[in-house]
């Protein structure tokens, strides 16, 4: 019997690690830097996962202020991005898939260098065949990261004809739909 899935992509924030506290803290800090109102915890939690440009834009910010908020968030988050812990069982699952020969990749809205550093910090850099993440470009979206991950896996010889992404948010679902792959 062969696997019906040829490669598995994983979102990082909210799927591999519980990054909500660090994300929300950086978000609050960026808004506080400009004395801007801070959304309540429930609304703030909806900004864990989406691209930063969307999240701050959703609050009505644009132009130079939007860019400053994104940069302020990144500076604050960079100081704590290694703090989030993996969800229970995730590390074992990733090792089991890797040991079974399933090609694995990240496909995260987190910037690629941070994703690599975080996977290295968790001891997972050798479990993933590809660590793909967003670029600083506001046009970088989940679907482009998914396509990059699949292209890089294919370049390494993986069969990418039956991919799936594992994620936790509507952004993962939308990105998968746009990229034309199933999502769990």
Give, region by region, the residue ranges found by the protein language model.
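Helix-loop "lid/cap" segments that line or gate small-molecule binding pockets
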Residues: 30, 50-64, 118, 149-153
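Metal-dependent phosphoesterase signature
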Residues: 57-95
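Active-site neighborhood of HAD-like aspartate-dependent phosphohydrolases
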Residues: 2-46
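Substrate-recognition element of Asp-dependent hydrolases with the DxDx(T/V) motif
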Residues: 27, 90-119, 132-134
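Glycine-rich phosphate-binding loop signature in dinucleotide/nucleotide-binding domains
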Residues: 2-3, 99-102, 152-160
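Conserved donor sugar-nucleotide recognition element shared by glycan-biosynthetic enzymes
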Residues: 23, 48, 86, 142
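Substrate-recognition "cap/lid" segment bordering the active-site pocket of phosphatases
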Residues: 83, 113-164, 170-179
């Amino acid at each position: 019997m062969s696997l019906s899935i040829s490669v598995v992509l994983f979102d990082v924030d909210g799927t591999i690690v519980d990054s909500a506290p660090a994300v929300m803290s950086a978000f609050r800090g960026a808004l506080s830097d400009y004395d801007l109102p801070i959304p309540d915890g429930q609304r703030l939690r909806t900004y864990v996962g989406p691209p930063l440009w969307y999240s701050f834009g959703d609050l009505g910010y644009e132009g130079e202020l939007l860019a400053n908020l994104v940069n302020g968030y990144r500076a604050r988050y960079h100081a704590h991005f290694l703090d989030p812990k993996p969800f229970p069982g995730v590390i074992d699952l990733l090792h089991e898939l890797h040991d079974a020969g399933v090609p694995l990749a990240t496909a995260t809205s987190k910037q690629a260098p941070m994703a690599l550093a975080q996977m290295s910090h968790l001891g997972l850099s050798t479990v993933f065949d590809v660590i793909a993440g967003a670029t600083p470009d506001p046009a970088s979206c989940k679907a482009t990261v998914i396509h990059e991950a699949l292209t890089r896996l294919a370049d390494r010889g993986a069969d990418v004809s039956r991919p799936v992404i594992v994620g936790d948010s509507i952004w993962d679902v939308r990105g998968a739909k746009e990229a034309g792959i199933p999502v769990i």
